[in-house]
Amino acid sequence: MGSKESINSKKIWLDLHMELTDNNYETIIKNNENPVFIDFYSPTCGPCQMLTKLIDTRLEKYGEEQGVQVVKCDISKNPKLASAFKIRSVPFTIAVLKDETLKYPEVGLKNETYYFELIDKLAGKGSFLSRLFT
């Protein structure tokens, strides 16, 4: 029975790996027991597309392994969230902790290591690079 519960928990986690929208904000952010990393983007933004590719190919899976929800939000389709987070430039990333505290707001594309180390911080672990060399 324990393994079935694990599978059900995993299924819920995977079901929530989706685009953050004006409509599902409550479900993903307010009801989440894990920190959430949000990437606000525009489909017409070149640097945003680079970050989206990183999220889709590697960062989302890494976040899941570390217990951090990684989501994206298209500001052109979600004006309420863009307004609530006062988005003026993209890409804009921010973390929402379990208690809904906002941390680590960043505008612009950072290097890949930055995002992996931020996931580590949110998970309460040492840096990604330090774990590679120990």
List the model feature ranges, each with a label.
Residues 26, 79-82:
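Short hydrophobic/charged patches on amphipathic alpha-helices used for structural packing
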Residues 1-15, 57, 126-134:
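N-terminal targeting signals for export/organelle localization
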Residues 44-51:
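Short, thiol/selenol-centered motifs that function as redox-active sites or metal-ligating centers
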Residues 16-30:
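Short, charged low-complexity linear segments at domain edges
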Residues 89, 94-130:
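Non-catalytic, surface beta->alpha helical segment in thiol-disulfide oxidoreductase systems
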Residues 84-88:
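A short glycine-leucine-enriched loop at secondary-structure breakpoints
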Residues 31-43:
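Short active-site neighborhood of thiol/selenol oxidoreductases, capturing the structured segment around
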Residues 19-21, 40, 52-59, 64-80:
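Thiol-based oxidoreductase modules, predominantly thioredoxin-like and allied folds used
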